[in-house]
């Protein structure tokens, strides 16, 4: 029963964080792609740099924000599933934006140029743009979800790995292994492996 609860919680928090980061990241990257503004190049380089920052740093930042002495301490979100979602959201957002910008600057530009040559009405360009890029966008979503569900450091910091409340697959594996409970660790690891395998399979199908 505990294993099922851990798996469900992992899927729920990771899916929620991925969905929000993907939706917001998509529109932000589209805005950056279409608009010319001061420091645009610097912003893109900064976002790309954030994708390589150790995940535990994102967890620490969220921890400081949600801690009792932090600016959002009154919300009492620390060591809750919501805190995990927030940490994963900030972890995934730069990744989604960076990957989306790469897509827009590559295939996206070609689509817009083709639409311009063919003199396609502006009200139809958005529909064509999304239709042509739907498969790579789904790939970006799956990549983000894969990173979210495999996260350990940030999740441990803000979630606390509390049994029956904030314990997810990765933190459970880390704790059980440290305590010598290899049997249950292997079961959870196999479940996580199957999920990762399915994501990889879907990515190959969409590619």
Q: Where are the regions that the model predicts?
A:
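Interhelical loop and adjacent transmembrane-helix boundary motif
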Residues: 1-2, 158-205
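Periplasmic/extracellular loop-to-transmembrane helix junction in inner-membrane transport proteins
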Residues: 1-16, 34-37, 129, 178-181
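C-terminal transmembrane helix and the adjacent membrane-cytosol boundary/short C-terminal tail
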Residues: 94-128, 185-207
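Transmembrane-helix boundary motif in ABC transporter permease subunits
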Residues: 16-47, 106, 122-125, 129-130, ...
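Membrane-interfacial helix termini and adjacent extracytoplasmic/periplasmic loops
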Residues: 58-89, 158-162
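Residues that define the loop-to-transmembrane-helix transition and helix capping
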Residues: 12, 38-41, 54, 81-82, ...
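Hydrophobic alpha-helical elements at and bordering transmembrane segments
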Residues: 3, 7, 11, 43-49, ...
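Transmembrane alpha-helices
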Residues: 19, 99-100, 122-154
């Amino acid at each position: 029963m505990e294993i099922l609860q851990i798996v469900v919680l992992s899927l729920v928090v990771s899916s929620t964080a991925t969905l929000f980061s993907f939706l917001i990241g998509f529109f932000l990257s589209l805005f950056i792609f279409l608009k010319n503004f001061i420091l645009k190049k610097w912003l893109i380089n900064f976002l790309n740099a954030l994708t390589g920052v150790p995940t535990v740093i994102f967890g620490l930042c969220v921890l400081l924000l949600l801690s009792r002495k932090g600016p959002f301490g009154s919300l009492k979100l620390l060591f809750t599933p919501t805190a995990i979602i927030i940490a994963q959201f900030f972890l995934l957002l730069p990744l989604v934006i960076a990957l989306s910008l790469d897509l827009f600057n590559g295939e996206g530009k070609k689509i817009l140029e083709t639409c311009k040559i063919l003199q396609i009405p502006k009200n139809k360009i958005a529909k064509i743009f999304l239709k042509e890029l739907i498969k790579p966008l789904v790939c970006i979503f799956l990549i983000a979800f894969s990173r979210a569900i495999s996260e350990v450091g940030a999740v441990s910091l803000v979630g606390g790995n509390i049994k029956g409340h904030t314990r997810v697959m990765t933190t459970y594996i880390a704790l059980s292994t440290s305590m010598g409970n290899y049997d249950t660790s292997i079961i959870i690891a196999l479940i996580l492996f199957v999920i990762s395998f399915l994501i990889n399979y879907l990515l190959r199908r969409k590619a």
